[in-house]
From Swiss-Prot:
The gene is psbE. The lineage of its organism: Eukaryota, Viridiplantae, Chlorophyta, Ulvophyceae, Oltmannsiellopsidales. Its cofactor is heme b. GO terms for cellular component: chloroplast thylakoid membrane; photosystem II reaction center. This is Cytochrome b559 subunit alpha. With its partner (PsbF) binds heme. PSII binds additional chlorophylls, carotenoids and specific lipids. This b-type cytochrome is tightly associated with the reaction center of photosystem II (PSII). PSII is a light-driven water:plastoquinone oxidoreductase that uses light energy to abstract electrons from H(2)O, generating O(2) and a proton gradient subsequently used for ATP formation. It consists of a core antenna complex that captures photons, and an electron transfer chain that converts photonic excitation into a charge separation. It comes from Oltmannsiellopsis viridis.
């Protein structure tokens, strides 16, 4: 004999006015917040990744490749030095 879990059926949730009122506000808000997070450059600052114009400097135009996995830290330090 099977019982119920006490949860609302998914079809009841999707046809609920309350569901659509809440989600019609939160989904666009999350989209706008994400767009602002990236477009203002805050995402670059928070995660520490270089901005698109900082990948290549005037002095260093080659691609910085790590070739030795055991000396990777020293290679990263030498490639990130400002010359």
């Amino acid at each position: 004999m099977s019982g119920t879990t006490g949860e609302r059926p998914f079809s009841d949730i999707l046809t609920s006015i309350r569901y659509w009122v809440i989600h019609s506000i939160t989904v666009p808000s999350l989209f706008i917040a994400g767009w602002l997070f990236v477009s203002t450059g805050l995402a670059y600052d928070v995660f520490g990744s270089p901005r698109p114009n900082e990948y290549f400097t005037e002095d260093r135009q080659e691609t910085p490749l790590i070739t030795d996995r055991f000396e990777a830290l020293s290679q990263v330090k030498s490639q990130s030095e400002i010359k």
